[in-house]
């Protein structure tokens, strides 16, 4: 991958977190994502699912800030994101799964999850809606959600969502 491709990928990853477009990632971005999901799926913030989503958003923010907020100002700039989050997540993709899992689990529950064999799943359509609400273009959301249904049964397991999100945010550096 060349440097221009790397920069494009980083910009997309950063924009996915920067929900309000103010050029930095902060707690408000994670809360905004939670609020959008709750509104889209008609879930009240004070119910168990709503509280779990906000708790997951806070855990996600704390994890992101812990690995990327170098100056401690409770904001992650693009430079901090590239130098901190992207590098650390590339070095340890499992770390991303750890910090993202509570939010993703709660998001799946809000999207209308069902339990199958002890795992949480959501329909492909629900995951597609969630991706659109979080800022993905319609065609990208459709393709991404469809690709997560690996067995073709119309549902997507939590583990598949976590793995896919971790893979998406693990950006390989450009060729030297």
Model regions and ranges:
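Amphipathic regulatory helices of Ca2+-sensor modules
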Residues: 25-45, 76-91, 121-135, 157-171
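The feature marks the first
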Residues: 1-50
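Primarily EF-hand calcium-binding motifs
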Residues: 7-22, 51-73, 101-119, 140-158
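Short helix-capping and inter-helix turn/linker motifs at the boundaries of alpha-helical repeat units
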Residues: 1-5, 55-56, 98-99, 134-136
């Amino acid at each position: 991958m060349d440097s221009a491709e790397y920069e494009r990928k980083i910009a997309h990853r950063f924009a996915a977190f920067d929900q309000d477009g103010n050029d930095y990632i902060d707690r408000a971005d994670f809360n905004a994502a939670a609020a959008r999901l709750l509104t889209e799926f008609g879930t009240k913030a004070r119910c168990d699912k709503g509280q779990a989503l906000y708790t997951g958003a806070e855990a996600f923010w704390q994890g992101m800030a812990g690995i990327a907020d170098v100056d401690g100002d409770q904001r992650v700039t693009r430079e901090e994101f590239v130098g901190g989050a992207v590098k650390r997540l590339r070095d340890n993709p499992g770390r991303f799964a750890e910090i993202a899992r509570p939010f993703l689990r709660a998001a799946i529950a809000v999207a209308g999850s069902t339990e199958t064999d002890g795992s949480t799943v959501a329909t492909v359509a629900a995951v597609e809606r969630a991706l659109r609400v979080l800022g993905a273009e319609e065609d990208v959301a459709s393709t991404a959600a469809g690709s997560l249904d690996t067995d073709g049964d119309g549902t997507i397991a939590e583990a598949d969502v976590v793995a896919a999100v971790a893979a998406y945010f693990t950006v390989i550096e450009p060729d030297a």
